[in-house]
């Protein structure tokens, strides 16, 4: 397939000598204005000239961008993806920097919550709080990458230093390594370049004490050396949830040294401090009734006050250093070596809800009590990745070959805090250990019994550092090879294979007993497929891919088998089971229209995950059964992105999926749907350019109902009532923005998120005790200066 996209097939063509041209073509703060000639066959030169005129006044220099189409990325930032996205045989949704700005989203969790096919998971005492994502029904909290290298641990992730965010859907282990059953998330960060000079400052204020200031500056020091700095400070209260807030400090510094066309060195440092006092939201009572024909289902308690306690926190710190060397020994071949060292920490003490069940016999509710969720995690990791990328011909056949090796050492210490509750209890409730004193915030009629201020000082905890209860480490050596072969301009095949040899260690301490778990194994994964271009603008593909998940592969857990921690069958040893295995089939079509400015996509897919580890009991112990479960997800995904008209820009995606447990050690689970799984999701974003200086638009998001449960397991179910137990309702949300450029250097943007002030929940804890509450309406004003 060597036609109009020939220029981007070359490995690193947008990172090496060609990077300046690609960046210059994409420069504009009002790219839609340049896009007004997008469909004018005679206007191509005018677009380039127009953007070049304001090169020094802009910070939109993403080398992967589609010139003149700010919502559309032309290529992936992952060097293993050698084709343009319109000819990549997999569903990959890309969110550009301008999309994120106009959505008004800044944390990665909020960004991904708007992506169809992705849902958000909760933390609790079985798995850690932090960013948790579920892609096409499968856990992806360990499948997060930055510039193609794994970003381990449970932390808060920001977008202030990001060019674009890529969500790959479907098993990707030949690209990503272990995990990635449902897909992976890859953030492409901003890099220094000698090809341009700019400074951009954004300062925002808004309702609920919203303040946010960012700086993005790129300075060429010489013809061969450049520096780029991104700085962040942000603070906001959670809308209409007084007492809960979020604060961010960030810095990202990049240096690029390119003394010749055959050698380049890029060094990056990244830091983020995130300090939150989270609000865990409401709760949903368990259904009541006498049988399947007499069932009452309850909606979440909408009027729950903010019950966050004094001293509650969710704090994350991230520090990483990355070095990359690019060597082009001769035309068509590039050697890339990437090294990263990182340290992250994530600690939290949070307050949730418990109880509140309704008793139809007395027409009363059980008191709602407060619960504590706590833990901390210290992560240290090192990774080195070596790639050889070659473009060459064997006769009339063109190859894009990648050979690679990777070494990684991930170490995670999970621990707890020592907590003492000093506040006076005010009720007695029944639990597993019988009756015990407790902290109740409601009476039998669900009336809150504390005032707005005193409710935050009920428990009065003192917090001290505790002990480590899980010392987790995985050391991995990987080798891989993949090739994309163009036989003709209309026919190509692609394939790859990867081997990950790993050594696993996890020393778990539970109630004074220390248990070491160790084993080693090797994972083999691959992908293969075919692509056909019946028309120049249309690409039809079929793709097959596999993925593997290792026993105990989730780093935030010890011996909690039901949450991705280590599982041990009493009759076998830890290493006697196979890794969980997944395979995916995807049939898709992509049409890149209007001179590559408008992309339509459609895909049908099926993911089957087998050899699933299943827990015994409540999932908080290592006891379980090895390789007894299986589940399946089938679905359709449709997407569009680009310029519909010269003035109207859009991105939209729709997923329609179905999930089912097809085999289990527990026969009652067979036939049920997966937990935390939304059958239907939609997101659409529009931008209309009224004049060269004025634009407005908005976003609409829909997510169908979900049902809570343990990760990668059947949703919680009441067999007596024949109903799923805890339902997270479906919802629509709408956002809007308007922007104006006062001149070439100054502009302003207004964002209003959740315009209708919808009361909605993004996910729920498996027993319904708390539901993550979505933010209520917020309005912000951002002033931008470009120099």
Please place each PLM-identified region on the residue numbering:
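Acidic, small-polar-rich N-terminal luminal/periplasmic segments of exported/outer-membrane proteins
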Residues: 23, 50-196, 587
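Outer-membrane beta-barrel translocator/receptor signature
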Residues: 161-163, 174-251, 259-263, 319, ...
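Acidic/polar loop-and-plug regions of large Gram-negative outer-membrane beta-barrel proteins
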Residues: 234-239, 247, 251-258, 262-328, ...
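Structural signature of Gram-negative outer-membrane beta-barrels, strongest in the C-terminal barrel
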Residues: 256-260, 379, 398-410, 417, ...
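Face-selective signature of the C-terminal outer-membrane beta-barrel domain
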Residues: 321, 326-342, 372-507
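Membrane-embedded beta-barrel scaffold of Gram-negative outer-membrane proteins
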Residues: 326-328, 332-340, 344-352, 576-661, ...
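Gram-negative outer-membrane beta-barrel transporters
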Residues: 489, 603-608, 626-715, 756-757, ...
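C-terminal beta-signal and adjacent terminal beta-strands/loops
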Residues: 704-712, 739-787
